[in-house]
Design a protein with these regions (language model features):
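ATP-dependent NMP and nucleoside kinases share a basic, alpha-helical "lid"
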Residues: 110-113, 136-174
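Small-molecule kinase domains that catalyze NTP-dependent phosphoryl transfer to phosphate-bearing small molecules
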Residues: 109, 150-151, 155-156, 177-228, ...
Length: 234
């Protein structure tokens, strides 16, 4: 079983994912995986693990050929700003890039699922018990993506969905601290993302991430145990 972990910018999805990883639940971060597709070096071992594998298809040449544009810096490395400027101002270009990236994500995720025991440490955790007839932990994985629910062409890779939410002011505060941008810039990004209400019928559980990191694991366990038939040890 695969659970989609999603939510708006600044909601704290990555914090929830790291808690799930510590519990031994295999997790896949689609955003980190896509960086690998563009040839961006991942910053840490945890980012390598979250993206599933370091062996990513290099999609940048295919994207450049499809759009007839170059997205490289002078040194030949990927220029994310050039790509963003090109696709977010042209829906046709965006759809072209998505038609290349989305199938690659599905294939990469499937490959990672097959090797989950080697890819994610602690894939069998003492924090999770499996009652009779419940989902085996080895068959459970988290697919983290901020945009999967918003994209009609995104492959339906998940069986259940957990949404991470937080009050808007807290989300703004987190993103300003992380990205060193202005309040107005953060609010404009938030406005571009559909809220929870737009996807309520597709969401199986909500984690309200407005608490301390010490209290958050309890909320994560509660959401996970209400979504699938596994019993979480206190």
């Amino acid at each position: 079983m695969t659970i989609l972990l999603t939510g708006g910018i600044g909601s704290g999805k990555s914090s929830v994912r790291r808690i799930l990883e510590r519990m031994g639940v295999p997790c896949y971060d689609a955003d980190s995986a896509v960086k690998g597709f563009y040839g961006v070096p991942l910053k840490s071992e945890s980012e390598h693990l979250a993206s599933g594998t370091t062996e990513k298809p290099f999609l940048l040449p295919e994207i450049e050929a499809a759009l007839g544009l170059s997205f490289r810096k002078i040194d030949g490395s990927f220029d994310s700003r050039k790509l963003a400027d090109a696709i977010f101002s042209d829906s046709g270009r965006l759809k072209t890039v998505e038609s290349i990236v989305f199938p690659a994500l599905a294939t990469d995720f499937a490959r990672c699922r097959k090797t989950v025991g080697q890819t994610v440490p602690g894939a069998v955790s003492s924090a999770v018990e499996r009652p009779a007839g419940a989902t085996p932990l080895a068959d459970l994985a988290i697919f983290e993506s901020a945009t999967a629910l918003d994209k009609p062409d995104f492959p339906k890779l998940w069986d259940k969905c957990i949404w991470v939410d937080a009050p808007e002011d807290l989300r703004v505060e987190r993103v300003i601290a992380r990205d060193h941008c202005s309040r107005e810039q953060v609010l404009s990004r938030i406005r571009l993302q559909p809220p929870l209400e737009a996807h309520r019928s597709e969401v199986d559980a909500v984690i309200l991430n407005d608490c301390s990191l010490q209290d958050l694991p309890m909320r994560v366990r509660s959401a996970l145990s209400s979504t699938i038939p596994i019993r979480i040890k206190p």
